[in-house]
């Protein structure tokens, strides 16, 4: 449940978890477009950790790679991350919005919201599930508001039944402009080779400029970094040489931290839009988070009833749109494009590729484009 809601590398708050989440989702959704926000998933699960006790807390700590059982330390760590995001007055808009909804048949532990409200900029909220469609509409409207209208239908009304105890909702909104924009006048109709035997029509953007890029022989792939305006965020694109080389490449670039070199590049990149939805329970169970979803779950820091409760649902929905301006941008500003002659590198993303949106420390989005 994330907006723009994406690859991986260096360290997010819990880098190893980010890698594993993406790998699991990638393998369970083969041959399709994918976009995920690992940091969003980590944040909402760390919120749950704040209300967990006993073996449930230890399970979350282990799966998330949290360095300490000290909840104040965990809160401080995520508080610093979210404060940094809120402090960005220029450049891309990047907003994380998390909420835990609890069936109002179960009383909330009021100390829980006191513990998470400031560091996580969020809280748990009671909700009536006597009317599932009404409850779903309320949650969906909140997600819609948090994502500037991009994430619609987050919760299936049919899933909101009275036996649901708690569900986790997370949205992340991103809007950024390229530091070097594509000129819309240079965008042309073209084709994208999905497989060796299948192609689809696309609108192919083009520009020439200086970018950090490189070709890695052992990866058999080109890598290019596209920075965002007034920001330390960038999108890195991983383009395999072979049309059907993405699967092998995704295995190799886990933990990618290779040097890129500033060079003149003639770049062609398709406009694309990705929407991805998944229920994360099965994925999280594979990460080792199992007790949370059973009657043995100890969430006595979240529920007033010491018998606690379990999490019934972890929904994830992501949306990403890339065009001439950047990510989820509106309007158009023309940029001069000179002749291609003399440029040392040609990168044409006309077949499946992987991407990441990140800064030096945190993975915000990761995904792949199989068919724009």
UniProtKB/Swiss-Prot annotation:
InterPro entries (alphabetical): Serpin_dom, Serpin_fam, Serpin_sf, Serpin_sf_1, Serpin_sf_2
Induction comment: Up-regulated by the Gram-positive bacterium M.luteus, the fungus B.bassiana and the yeast C.albicans.
Organism: Drosophila melanogaster
Signal sequence segment: 1-15
Record keywords: Glycoprotein, Immunity, Protease inhibitor, Secreted, Serine protease inhibitor, Signal
Segments traversing the membrane: none
One function term, GO molecular function aspect: serine-type endopeptidase inhibitor activity
Disruption phenotype: RNAi-mediated knockdown results in the constitutive expression of Drs.
Tissue note: Expressed in the ovary.
Family: Belongs to the serpin family.
This protein's name: Serine protease inhibitor 42Dd
Gene transcribed to yield this protein: Spn42Dd
Glycosylated sites: 197, 232
SUPFAM superfamilies reported in the protein's UniProt record: Serpins (SSF56574)
Any one Gene Ontology BP term: immune system process
Alphabetical list of PANTHER family matching this protein: ACCESSORY GLAND PROTEIN ACP76A-RELATED, SERINE PROTEASE INHIBITOR, SERPIN
GO CC, one annotated term: extracellular space
Cited function: Serine protease inhibitor with activity toward trypsin. Involved in innate immunity to fungal infection by negatively regulating the Toll signaling pathway and suppressing the expression of the antifungal peptide drosomycin. Acts upstream of SPE and grass, and downstream of the fungal cell wall pattern recognition receptor GNBP3. May function specifically in the GNBP3-dependent beta-1,3-glucan branch of the Toll pathway.
Localisation per UniProt entry: Secreted
């Amino acid at each position: 449940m994330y907006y723009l809601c994406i690859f991986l590398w260096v360290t997010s708050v819990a880098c190893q978890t980010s890698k594993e989440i993406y790998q699991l989702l990638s393998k369970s959704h083969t041959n399709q477009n994918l976009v995920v926000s690992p940091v969003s998933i980590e944040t909402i699960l760390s919120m749950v950790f704040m209300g967990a006790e006993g073996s449930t807390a230890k399970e979350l700590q282990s799966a998330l790679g949290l360095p300490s059982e000290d909840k104040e330390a965990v809160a401080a760590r995520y508080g610093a991350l979210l404060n940094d995001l809120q402090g960005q007055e220029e450049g891309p808009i990047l907003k994380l919005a998390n909420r835990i909804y609890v069936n109002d048949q179960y009383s909330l532990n009021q100390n829980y919201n006191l513990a998470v409200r400031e560091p996580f900029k969020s809280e748990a909220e009671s909700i009536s599930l006597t009317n599932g469609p009404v409850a779903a509409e309320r949650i969906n409207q909140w997600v819609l508001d948090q994502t500037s209208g991009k994430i619609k239908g987050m919760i299936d009304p049919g899933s909101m039944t009275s036996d649901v105890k708690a569900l986790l909702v997370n949205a992340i909104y991103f809007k950024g402009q390229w530091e070097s924009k594509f000129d819309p006048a240079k965008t042309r109709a073209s084709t994208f080779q999905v497989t060796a035997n299948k192609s689809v029509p696309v609108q192919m953007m083009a520009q020439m400029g200086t970018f950090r890029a490189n070709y890695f022989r052992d990866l058999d792939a080109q890598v290019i970094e596209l920075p965002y305006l007034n920001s330390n965020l960038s999108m890195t694109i991983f383009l395999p040489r072979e049309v059907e080389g993405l699967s092998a490449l995704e295995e190799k670039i886990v933990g990618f931290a290779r040097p890129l070199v500033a060079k003149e590049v003639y770049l062609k990149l398709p406009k694309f839009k990705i929407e991805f939805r998944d229920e994360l329970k099965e994925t999280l169970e594979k990460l080792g988070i199992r007790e949370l979803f059973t009657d043995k779950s100890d969430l006595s820091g979240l529920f007033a009833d010491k018998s606690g409760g379990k999490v019934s649902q972890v929904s994830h929905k992501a949306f990403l749109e890339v065009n001439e301006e950047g990510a989820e941008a509106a309007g158009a500003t023309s940029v001069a494009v000179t002749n291609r002659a003399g440029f040392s590198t040609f990168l044409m993303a006309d077949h499946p590729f992987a991407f990441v949106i990140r800064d030096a420390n945190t993975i915000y989005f990761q995904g792949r484009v199989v068919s724009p």
